[in-house]
Amino acid sequence: MENTVTQCGLDVALAVVGGKWKPLILYHVRGGPTRFSEVKRRVGGISEKVLVQQLREMVAMNVLVRRDHNRVPPVVDYALTPFGETLVEALVPLCTWGNRNRAEVTEMLQREGGQEV
């Protein structure tokens, strides 16, 4: 039997927000209820299929709430839950770090493989 020891809370946080898209989605819904089409436009580069999957996962994890306004045409928006708000608060320092180090990271990534930030 394998004994798994949690080294820190980072593995727990990454289980909720891990991956390329979830932190960006959270960043773009932090200002209040946001319609699906607006999330897709703000995030940029994400397919509709992947966005639907990521939103469903975050709703299932109680990070976001999905609200269907039962109108025609359909109006659905997503908002942070109180639990999700605490997660966004935890991501703010990471965002600050990224802004502060953008030039250096961009230079390193371009030097290594031509990737842009």
State what each model feature region is.
Residues 33, 43, 55, 84, ...:
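Short amphipathic alpha-helical/adjacent loop interface patches that line ligand
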Residues 4-50, 71, 77, 85, ...:
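N-terminal helix-turn-helix DNA-binding core of bacterial DNA-binding proteins
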Residues 2, 80, 116-117:
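Loop-helix junctions at membrane interfaces
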Residues 3-4, 13, 62-63, 90:
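Short, contiguous, well-ordered secondary-structure segments
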